UniProtKB/Swiss-Prot annotation:
The keyword Cytoplasm belongs to this UniProt entry's keyword annotation: yes
Family named by the database record: Belongs to the PIERCE1 family.
Any single Gene Ontology cellular-component annotation: axonemal A tubule inner sheath
Region called Disordered, residue ranges: 1-27
UniProt keywords, alphabetically: Cell projection, Cilium, Cytoplasm, Cytoskeleton, Flagellum
Organism: Bos taurus
Known partners and oligomeric status: Microtubule inner protein component of sperm flagellar doublet microtubules. Interacts with CFAP53, ODAD1 and ODAD3; the interactions link the outer dynein arms docking complex (ODA-DC) to the internal microtubule inner proteins (MIP) in cilium axoneme.
Record's signal peptide: none
Cellular localization per UniProt: Cytoplasm, Cytoskeleton, Cilium axoneme; Cytoplasm, Cytoskeleton, Flagellum axoneme
Tissue and organ distribution: Expressed in trachea multiciliated cells.
Pfam families from the UniProt entry: PIRC1_2
Listed name of the protein: Piercer of microtubule wall 1 protein
Length: 136
């Protein structure tokens, strides 16, 4: 018992650090104003680790379950201008308050026929109980 167990006295080894995550700028020439999230694809989290049953797996699930790589990240960033949104916020969206008095034409019945409220049962020329309109 006077002899100490060498395993018990040894300090636990620290886990070795892996290689740093790849950056898009390591592989491609990127724009200077590229946001940091696009230069570091390893920052994206929340990708699926649990596999769903293969019977119900779709191609979108297969594509969306993988985290992006440096080859799929954008190299240039074009920020959107909010000029239109600021103008709409000041004046509001355009509102059309006119009354629609045009009788609507149906795509089903063709350009010659109009859908009317009083002709509910025979709105289509071929919709007849006794025989189709081809027999006329």
């Amino acid at each position: 018992m006077s002899e100490e167990d060498p395993k018990a006295c040894a300090e636990p080894e620290e886990p070795k650090a892996g290689p740093p995550p790849e950056k898009t700028s390591d592989w491609y020439r990127v724009s200077e104003d590229l946001p940091a999230r696009f230069n570091n694809p390893a920052w994206f989290r929340g990708y699926r680790t649990k596999e769903p049953p293969s019977v119900y797996r779709t191609s979108n699930q297969a594509y969306g379950s993988r985290a992006p790589t440096v080859h799929e990240m954008p190299k240039v960033f074009y920020p959107n201008s909010y000029k239109f949104s600021r103008q709409v916020a000041v004046g509001g969206m355009f509102q059309n308050n006119t009354l629609n008095v045009y009788m609507e034409k149906s795509i089903v019945t063709g350009p010659d026929n109009y859908i009317t409220s009083y002709d509910r049962l025979n709105f289509h020329p071929s919709y007849r109980v006794c025989r189709p309109s081809i027999c006329d």
